Amino acid sequence: MRKGLVLFILGAAALSACGRAGTRQPVLPRNALPVPIIRQSSGHTCGAAALLAVLYYWQVYEGNESGLLGATGTAVDGTTPQGIVKGAREYGLAAYYKEMVTIDALQAALSGGETVILDIQAWPDKPEEMPWAKRREDGHYVVLTALDKEYAYFMDPSVGTGYTYIKLPELMERWHDYENLKGGVWNNERLAVFVRGKTPMKEYPAALTPTQ
């Protein structure tokens, strides 16, 4: 997965108002998963940063992003879905990826307590010149935190100041990517990495603890 160095905030700003009058403003649902907000350290480490947030959420890891680069096989061209699955399993989590995932399947995963990492397109330089459906050079990993009837909400590692959102129809247009594998180019569609652990965070930020 290729990662641009220009960081683009999904949905214009972290949970800011929609621009057009009459459009319902996105509001983070009360049942949103309290996934920790992690900022990726470079343009190609969004996969490792997304996994880091998930590991923190399941309370199985206390290290940093750089400690996951080897486990996930992250290189200058990014992280593969297989690498994210491998990294999650290395820390005792159940993980797998799947293509052609539906919105209903995402909702079922969230309702069942799973964390989900999506592989989408982001950061368009000139979005008016090429529709999302034709873009594959701007792959980016985000962690799904909630869904409602109009929006998907994410922990986006390119942001770092709050959660982000995308309208569901737009998500369906952006939800694809490609990977250069040894066997050739793999064009994936609606790919998601599903991760489950035993001890999820109850809230974020967590309760106060004394400084050691």
Residue ranges and their predicted role:
Residues 47-55, 65-69, 81-85, 103, ...:
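Extracytoplasmic/secreted envelope proteins and their assembly/folding machinery
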Residues 19-22, 129, 135-136, 145-212:
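Noncatalytic regulatory segments and standalone regulatory/sensor domains
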Residues 74-104:
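Mid-chain, structured segments of secreted extracytoplasmic proteins
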Residues 4-5, 11, 15-80, 122-123, ...:
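Active-site-adjacent structural segments surrounding the nucleophilic cysteine of cysteine proteases
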Residues 99-158, 164:
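Active-site-adjacent substructure of cysteine-protease-like catalytic cores
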